[in-house]
Design a protein with these regions (language model features):
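Zn2+-dependent peptidoglycan hydrolase active-site motif and core
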Residues: 53, 70-112, 116, 133-151, ...
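Acidic, glycine-rich catalytic/binding loops that coordinate metals and/or anionic ligands
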Residues: 118, 139-183
């Protein structure tokens, strides 16, 4: 019999406290049933004109209309078209002992099913993955190769999931329960 012992060292950043989610895996996977990741957190080649070369979240492969859920209990703090993020829903975590924690769900369906100020519970459906193309958005500067306006900096439907602790973007895979794998 072979026994493996793993020791993990978590680098401490003076601006970020390590939250209990890291140890307990309390945050739910945001896109139930969809575990493929098209783009990871960190440096990358920009997939489309106007997209950042530093990816501030993860892109989960999910078809248009797929539901996404609240990863934690909290309050919807923003809904709107957010440049490269397209239609975005932001959830502010109710857990305040570790500072302010926000989760962004980008490239959402424009027919948002929650409202700003609404309290939601972990696991509650709060939106759907949106279409690649959206029309009638004033100030949208993102277009596909055919000149059609897109839902932010995107090449197709997917859920971009981002996480900020005290305003600093962090890799969501360090905190999510499934880490993109079916258990």
């Amino acid at each position: 019999m072979t026994i493996f012992i793993c020791i993990f060292f978590i680098p401490q950043n003076s601006n970020i406290k390590v939250i209990n989610y890291l140890e307990t895996g309390e945050l739910l996977w945001p896109a139930p049933g969809y575990f493929g990741i098209n783009s990871y957190f960190g440096k990358r080649h920009a997939p489309t004109s106007g997209a950042s070369t530093f990816h501030k979240g993860i892109d989960i492969a999910a078809p248009q209309g797929s539901e996404y859920i609240a990863v934690a209990n909290g309050t919807i703090s923003f809904i709107g078209f957010l440049g490269g993020g397209g239609y975005t829903v932001t959830l502010t975590d109710e857990n305040k002992e570790n500072g302010e924690i926000k989760y962004s769900y980008c490239h959402s369906d424009p027919n948002i099913i929650v409202s700003v100020g609404q309290k939601v519970v972990k696991g509650q459906v709060i939106g759907k993955v949106g279409p690649k193309n959206v029309y009638g958005v004033q100030g949208n500067r993102y277009f596909d190769s055919k000149g059609n306006p897109t839902n932010g900096a995107t090449t197709g439907p997917h859920l971009h999931f981002g996480m900020r602790i005290n305003g600093e973007y962090v890799n969501p895979l360090n905190y999510l329960k499934n880490k993109g794998k079916i258990e």
